Amino acid sequence: MNSDEITAIMENKYSIDCVQLVLSPHLPGKGQKTHEGAGLISQTPNGSFLLKMYCSGNISPDDVLSRLDWKAGEIIHEEYYYHLTATDINGRQWEAKSIIPDIYLGLDTNRYIVHADIRELSYSSDLYDDVPAYSAAIYFPGDINVPFNTGVAVEKIVDGQNRSSSMKLNISKFSACDMKFELEKDVDWLTLNALSNTTIDDPLLMRMTESLQFVLARTLSWSIIELIHGKKRKVRVRSSQRNVVKSRVQPPIHFQQVDPSNKVWSLFGRYLSRTKGYTKELWHPIFRWIHAVIESGCSSLDTESLILSVATEGLLRDEFYNVHYGSAQLKTQIDDTRYIIAKLGLEKTFKDRVLGFLGNMLKPRAKDFLHILKDKNLVDSKLIEEYDKLRNSSAHGELADSSKFQIHLDRCAAALVLFYHIIFLAIGYSGPYTDYSTPGYPEKEFSCTGLP
């Protein structure tokens, strides 16, 4: 994909002129018709891709009216989905999945038009030269700020004469997980480039985008992914609106335009190292909570407080489930109590509830996990105290009192720092972070030494 095409996609002006389009049913043999014809795939002003194809042949009323069988609240059955193959005027073979066509009949009963929204398109092409390494380029639309560490020299040459020279700071270079990374900021997009001697597959691409979103505390959607290896190039293009800053949630490390020490990218590498072994094409369990917290910053402060509390508890349960809890004495006492209750002539339902309660005493609560970590000097007791106050009020639906707004803000900030500290422990990170629980937001050092 050339630079003009990339610019057109980022400006929502891209179109694919197709000499042949084929829409095939996802489940053959279900009576769904295959549609063929020429047409156009074009971007709408909001970044979506719209298919318009012109077909010939008879069409049944069932194909036109099939949507009338759908019921509100029910997931659309997969038999109604189609697979698209398209040949453009340059000979490239595009593919798209999970398409639901809309059919429009004309006055000529042997001709009809098909419209469809397309979420993602892809094509593969051959290269002349063999590229031994694996490379990936991910394009994110929008004005996305990152800390830079590399300048670019810009020269203005007129008639062979150098009229002026300047330096532009818009690139970051760093290494992580035996890969080389480079981020480049353009006017309307950010590009994340990765180079590796081992396979870069779809799950690893997800982990890379998660790492970037984590260190920036921003939800990001990509528009283009280009993968190159051997003599093959694969390009994926996706409907995506411009990424804009909506959340007030601050990143783990506050950054300026320049980051010569690469502290932000060190955290990027630590998260990637911890999560890259997760091979499902889903968000990593840690990132599910990170994403929830980032998105909570787009809502009210009360909503953010509640989600921060839930995310902290969920993260503790997911990542520290194997932490030793409960003394041998407690376990012995519970076993003795169970024995006594079992001998009593109690009604079965009541007895089962009491025994269940005793069993739960051996299952640590989120608060128990926090105190275990506190006893090992891994988290700050003051952060736990502020988190407890925030969690209790949020869980019981208590709205923030406007007269105590500063107190509520401070508790949210402390809860966010605690949330980040738990992530640091989960990924094994030691290094700088920004303490939003302290006025002035000083930078401090975190250590995961002593992690159980």
Kindly give the residue locations of the regions a language model identified.
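A generic structural signal for solvent-exposed, polar alpha-helical segments
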Residues: 20, 55, 76, 100, ...
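Short N-terminal signal/transit or membrane-insertion segments
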Residues: 3, 15, 101-114, 239-250, ...
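Internal, Lys/Arg-enriched amphipathic helical interaction segments that engage polyanionic partners
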Residues: 199-274
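Long, contiguous, compositionally biased segments that the model treats as domain-scale units
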Residues: 1-215, 219
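Short glycine-rich, low-complexity/disordered patches
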Residues: 65, 218-239, 350-358, 433-440
